[in-house]
Curated annotation (Swiss-Prot):
Family matches, as Pfam families: LolB
Keyword Nucleotide-binding: no
Keywords assigned: Cell outer membrane, Chaperone, Lipoprotein, Membrane, Palmitate, Protein transport, Signal, Transport
Lipid linkage positions (N-palmitoyl cysteine): C18
Function according to Swiss-Prot or TrEMBL: Plays a critical role in the incorporation of lipoproteins in the outer membrane after they are released by the LolA protein.
Protein name, per record: Outer-membrane lipoprotein LolB
Major localization listed first in the record, in broad terms: membrane
Length: 205
């Protein structure tokens, strides 16, 4: 059961990248589209961070929560999970082409991509690689999205690839307005992410 939760939590193990403002986005809401484009460009340059927080999941047969540490350095990530689901700890590391999941007292699992790891272990097809974008308050660039902006021209809601993402609060850190609380609603599970501390960094191209 713990491994099942860990794989779901591995949504967070993702790759940073680049995105432009384009026709794949449908923008509505109270914000200013031009200001959103500027905000998006600013956030897209953020390619490194350290996050400490909590994550929870609710599925038809499973629910639970745990603590989260997420280190991102451009295309490399190091995700560590512990807490009530832990019975030990889990660590997910990877970069393009190689993802590794280590679970205390259970073993090591590998796959070429986070999506492949989730499908292999759970049989679920999920947009895993979107999470590095969503956690920054950005839509993923490789598929269509519908955005609702708040009065500050930041994401309030995002619909993408069958997922609804709610941005409940933001905080300013080192010149970036970043999400503090996010809820993700999929067809058969809900994920809640509460970020206690953000340490954003722009590492370069």
């Amino acid at each position: 059961m713990f491994l099942r939760h860990v794989i779901v939590f591995s949504f967070i193990a993702l790759l940073a990248g680049c995105a432009g403002f384009g026709a794949r986005e449908s923008v509505e809401g109270h914000g200013n589209p031009a200001q959103w484009a500027a905000n998006k460009q600013h956030l897209t340059g953020l390619d490194g961070w350290q996050i400490d927080g909590k994550i929870g999941i609710r599925a038809p047969k499973d629910s639970g929560s745990g603590t989260l540490f997420w280190l991102q350095r451009q295309d490399y990530y190091d995700i560590r999970l512990s807490g009530p689901l832990g019975r030990g700890a889990a660590r997910l590391t990877g970069r393009p082409g190689a993802v590794s999941l280590e679970v205390a007292n259970q073993g090591r699992y590998e796959a070429p991509t986070p999506e492949a790891l989730v499908e292999e272990q759970l049989g679920w097809k999920l947009p895993v690689s979107h999470l590095a974008w969503w956690v920054r308050g950005l839509p993923a660039p490789d598929s269509k999205s519908r955005l609702t902006l708040d009065g500050n021209s930041r994401l309030a809601n995002l619909d993408q690839d069958g997922w609804q993402v709610e941005y409940l609060s933001y905080a300013e850190q080192n010149g970036y307005w970043l999400p503090e609380r996010i809820k993700l609603h999929g067809s058969d599970l809900d994920v809640t992410l509460v970020i206690k501390t953000w340490q954003p960094r722009k590492l370069g191209q």
